[in-house]
Amino acid sequence: MKTSSAKAKGRNLQKWVVSQLVEHLGANPEDIESRPMGSSGEDVIMGVQTRELFPYSVECKNQEKVNVWAAYEQSTANCGKYEPMVVIKKNHKKPLVVVDAEY
């Protein structure tokens, strides 16, 4: 797969997560956005209002073979004071969410 195609898959998942937060939490669309591909940090950028509704740091992985533990470690490294969360997806499957079971 081309790098541009892989980035497009990741970007689409990030946008899907943003749309779900807007739809289900009532988050203001201007207070939440998908991070540009290739940028460091969490994949979904949230403002103060959205953080109050959803105190998670989101890492998105849209890959056929995901190392869940490595993805969770990446989310943990980027989470700051928020709870790390990984959204994983593969072709033709629904997205799943990984969070610490003891949170």
Segments (PLM) and residue ranges:
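Catalytic phosphate/metal-binding cores of nucleic-acid and nucleotide-processing enzymes, i.e., regions
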Residues: M1-Y103
